[in-house]
Amino acid sequence: DPAYAALAPELIGMIGRDYTAGTNPPVFDIDGTLAGLAICFDVIYDPLIWEGARGGAQLFLFQTNNADFRGTDENQQQLAIARMRAIETGRSVVNSSTVGASQVIAPDGSTVDALDADVAGAMVTEVELRDGLTPAVVLGGWVPGLLALGAVVGLAIAGLRASTRTARAPSA
């Protein structure tokens, strides 16, 4: 992005661009189980998660490295988003962090297993596998558009009613 390059040209040049976006859904077959994958901040991108669910993911695996954000709420924010993704897609989510809290989250958003931040360990946890699509995944991007349209229509109706009342009001 040219705007960032103008702000810090010496730093922008240090960021490698030796990768490109894939063309397949972010779903991998792991011994017959289809797992949707997202790395770090990918979890915030609705289309990526929906594509994984639509691509047949039976669970999601989110990996992240929160080392740069120690002492902040970033890890808890990512866990909250992972929890929301479990509920939204109706799938189990395994959120694994190199230094932050790691959790196994059930499709209903409840925590099944967890490791605290900065605690070395491993979890071996049975997770529920699910197929099918939730209304959130099916409707996806339509919901914000419909809400925005509803807001515009509501404001237009309110504006028309207000102008009609003003026109009918007796003058003093």
Predicted regions: what they are:
Residues 1-172:
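Enzyme catalytic cores with a strong preference for nitrogen-chemistry domains
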